[in-house]
Swiss-Prot record:
Active site: C90, H177, E179
Role this protein plays: Catalyzes the synthesis of GMP from XMP.
Keywords: ATP-binding, Glutamine amidotransferase, GMP biosynthesis, Ligase, Nucleotide-binding, Purine biosynthesis
Name used for this protein in its record: GMP synthase [glutamine-hydrolyzing]
Organism this protein belongs to: Thermobifida fusca (strain YX)
Pathway linked to the protein: Purine metabolism; GMP biosynthesis; GMP from XMP (L-Gln route): step 1/1
Catalytic activity: XMP + L-glutamine + ATP + H2O = GMP + L-glutamate + AMP + diphosphate + 2 H(+)
Signal peptide: none
InterPro entries in UniProt: Class_I_gatase-like, GATASE, GMP_synth_C, GMP_synth_GATase, GMP_synthase, GMPS_ATP_PPase_dom, NAD/GMP_synthase, Rossmann-like_a/b/a_fold
Length: 528
């Protein structure tokens, strides 16, 4: 967790060993919801490296493999002899059992979905919980014999060993998934392991996170200056607010207004963010430049590349100006702040917290002579934690709870060429959708609601006494926790009716409103 030169973190650490299939991130989130810091590591990490992180506990995640299959991931040698409390979940439970001399086999009795389990209420994991409870299973293999010294603490109709423990060695295992919401006492099981078996302290709170990060940022940046590119999104805003609290006016934020934002967002960045943080802000009006570069382009990937290229060039020039101005005052600008989140770190294979900017995927392509050291104050946080940190820092709710918005902006929500006229049409429709969702109290229930203009499609309609040929608008409301998967949101019909009536009456050239009811997968959240 530490940055070179920064004070050691005061948080207890739980390592989640990732055996695949997206289970690890969910487990890590659930541990943090218990106010304990968690970090995901691969099963290939040597035990010595794990112990160097000073974990209070280790959790072995589920995974799609069979423990006895060739090439199946295993626990690193010596893991179960470290004395660190360990909880194995599903596949991790089976790895623990097999490694320590138990038996895992395919019994022919698989369990998928909700299952009733009978537990030993005098065991550490299940004390004070009902003897019979509902859990979520997802396994074909099963532990048929526990290792020596272990006690069976849970059974189902098809799994005679659904949980086990060796309390003297602080080793625990469950075949079910305590991290999923369908396991009715899953949080309690995790809390019993974290607080009682491992002695973890519930100190991973927003106040403590902010204090910890501010201290580490100050230690990293010292007396130097930093710059941050604001996109209008919550990640860059919270990252900038954290750094600004740490180093004050030695941070300069750059906001490139490419003209592709939604209604009122540019003004929100320029006014609300500065008012809330007092940060120094350099605004670059590049709307004409971006529209000129996008003229005649309809291919979505080409749009993305053009926008990325132009953004880099504009940001580069702004950065040069800031560096030059600082140089005149003998104050070097050595650091670039980015809003990288923990899922980005996990999916890219990790990182050491500081790297040269040209190697980072978020801002790749900056020229070689613009050398910065990265400051990534959010790289240990999930999205929901970032929002709570933003609230703790006093950022406006409209900014903190803003729906995710793509970097290329409205350009990839216009199916067809991007023009100033089409942007105005889409902005007006999008503003109505956001206003009505807010009025209905659905802001936080919906992950995001892209509004898509089918600019190259003409739809026949009747408005007034005449026939019209306008553009269709597509509403794409979805629910999600992390955008990896999503379901279409069941927005009440009366809200949809109000949105449709307002758009077709108030927005010129729109005569049809449609609803996208595709989940992800198979469809992505954005259309382009």
């Amino acid at each position: 967790m530490s940055v070179a030169g920064a004070p050691e973190s005061t948080f207890d650490t739980v390592l989640v060993v990732d055996f695949g299939a997206q289970y690890a991130q969910l487990i890590a989130r659930r541990v943090r919801e218990c106010h304990v810091y968690s970090e995901i590591v691969p099963p290939t990490m040597p035990v010595e490296e794990m112990l160097a992180k000073k974990p209070k506990a280790i959790i072995l995640s589920g995974g799609p493999s069979s423990v006895y299959a060739d090439g199946a991931p295993q626990a690193p040698p010596g893991l179960f002899d470290t004395g660190v409390p360990i909880l194995g979940i599903c596949y991790g439970f089976q790895v623990m059992a097999q490694t320590l001399g138990g038996t895992v086999e395919r019994t022919g009795r698989s369990e998928y979905g909700r299952t009733t389990i009978n537990v030993a209420t005098d065991s550490l994991l299940f004390h004070s919980l009902p003897q019979q409870q509902t859990v979520w299973m997802s396994h074909g293999d099963a532990v048929s014999q526990v290792p020596d010294g272990f006690t069976v603490t849970g059974q189902t109709a098809d799994a005679p060993v659904a949980a086990m423990e060796h309390r003297d060695r602080a080793l625990y295992g469950v075949q079910f998934h305590p991290e999923v919401v369908h396991t009715e006492h899953g949080r309690a099981v995790l809390q019993h392991f974290l607080y009682e078996a491992a002695g973890c302290r519930p100190t991973w709170t927003m106040v403590n996170i902010v204090e910890d990060q501010v201290a580490r940022i100050r230690a990293q940046i010292g007396s130097k200056r930093a710059i941050c590119g604001l996109s209008g999104g919550v990640d860059s805003a919270v990252a900038a607010a954290l750094v600004q609290r740490a180093i004050g006016d030695r941070l300069t934020c750059v906001f490139v207004d490419h003209g592709l934002l939604r209604q009122g967002e540019a003004e929100q960045v320029e006014k609300d963010f500065v008012a809330a943080t007092g940060a120094s802000l350099k605004v670059v009006d590049a709307q004409e430049r971006f529209l000129t570069a996008l003229a005649g382009v309809t291919d979505p990937e080409t749009k993305r590349k053009i926008i990325g290229r132009e953004f880099i060039r504009v940001f580069e020039q702004a950065a040069r100006e800031i560096v030059a101005e600082a140089g005149e005052g003998d104050e070097a600008v050595e650091f670039l702040v980015q809003g990288t989140l923990y899922p980005d770190v996990v999916e890219s294979g990790g990182g050491n917290g500081t790297a040269n900017i040209k190697s980072h995927h978020n801002v790749g392509g900056l020229p070689d002579d613009l050398q910065f050291t990265l400051v990534e104050p959010l790289r240990e946080l999930f999205k929901d934690e970032v929002r709570r940190v933003g609230e703790e820092l006093g950022l406006p709710a409209e900014m903190v709870w803003r729906h995710p918005f793509p970097g290329p902006g409205l350009a990839i929500r216009i199916v067809g060429e991007v023009t100033a006229e089409r942007l105005e049409i889409l902005r007006a429709a999008d503003a109505i959708v956001r206003e009505e969702l807010t009025r209905a109290g659905l802001d936080r229930a919906i992950w995001q609601c892209p509004v898509v203009l089918l600019a190259d499609v003409r739809s026949v309609g009747v408005q007034g006494d005449g026939r019209t040929y306008g553009h269709p608008i597509v509403l794409r409301p979805v629910t999600s926790e992390d955008a990896m998967t999503a379901d279409w949101a069941r927005v009440p019909y009366d809200v949809l009716a109000t949105i449709s009536n307002r758009i077709t009456n108030e927005v010129p050239d729109i005569n049809r409103v449609t609803l996208d009811i595709t989940s992800k997968p198979p469809g992505t959240i954005e259309w382009e």
